[in-house]
């Protein structure tokens, strides 16, 4: 449920963001996502991935990519868990940095 302060600012059906498709099969298209769309997605991902407050998420996806933003960053904020982000170019230069970072963070 929305807090009373949040519900004064926006309604669940209000437009939250326009997410552009990659355009891999044509011109990129803007997809209108409501607050409800995003909150529902976050809830489903939380349940499907069995995320708990004890979890830490490590990833290298940029925030301009939909999964980097919605599937990683916002999931961490929504669940109030630790997010460790590896810069994408660092990962591309040295993919083993991912495993090194996991070892370091344990």
Residues covered by each model-derived region:
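Short, well-ordered beta-strand segments
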Residues: 16, 56-58
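Short secondary-structure boundary/capping segments
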Residues: 9, 27, 34, 73-79
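AMP-binding (ANL) adenylation modules
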Residues: 61-65
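Single conserved hydrophobic/aromatic residue that forms the stacking wall/gate
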Residues: 1-10
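Conserved sugar-transfer catalytic core signal across GT-A, GT-B, and GT-C glycosyltransferases
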Residues: 5, 17, 72
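Conserved AMP-binding/adenylation subdomain of ANL enzymes
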Residues: 39-56, 66-106
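Conserved AMP-binding A3 loop
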Residues: 16-40
